[in-house]
Amino acid sequence: MRTRSIQLTAVLILGLHRAAMAAPVQADKIVILKSAHSMSLLNGGKTLKTYKVALGSVPVGPKRVEGDHKTPEGDYIIDAKNAHSQFHLSLHISYPSAADQERARRLGSRPGGAIMIHGLAAPFAYLGPLHRQTDWTDGCVAVTNAEIEEIWKLVPVGTKVEIRP
């Protein structure tokens, strides 16, 4: 009887250990450094993974108005995921904030929107990491399709996003 209890306990502990090992640690924050063309996923202040990224085709300076092709700067969250994106998979960044909207209003324009972290459209997927040779998006943050698949698993809706110059 005692042997059976020990065996059962060992099986349960091993099973829990394997389950814990299989579940990836999820990010609680994303930090995008525009000047370095990098995006880091963090958990508890520790870097889980860093990716090289392509940005808006006018990468210097914060996004101010719709159509300026700039990637925004500031604090946002991931507020939605799109498994049917034309860019393979995408995570929506909560731009524009109330401050972004007010700034655009003062400039007599709209702030724009649809800022995402995304992969590559099907016709360009073959480029893989070569897509990073130039900044080409309308203001989004682009990674390879393999990378967005990994990011998709690690980043839940509600994750904080900090975009720095």
Regions found by a protein language model. Name each.
Residues 1-4:
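Positively charged n-region of N-terminal signal peptides that target proteins for export
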Residues 7-17:
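Bacterial N-terminal signal peptides
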Residues 19, 35, 56-58, 96-98, ...:
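Generic structural motif
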Residues 22-66, 160, 165:
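Intrinsically disordered, low-complexity
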Residues 23-26, 67, 80-165:
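Exported/periplasmic cell-wall-interacting domains
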Residues 36-38, 75, 114:
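Structural motif
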Residues 61-78:
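Short, surface-exposed secondary-structure junctions/capping segments
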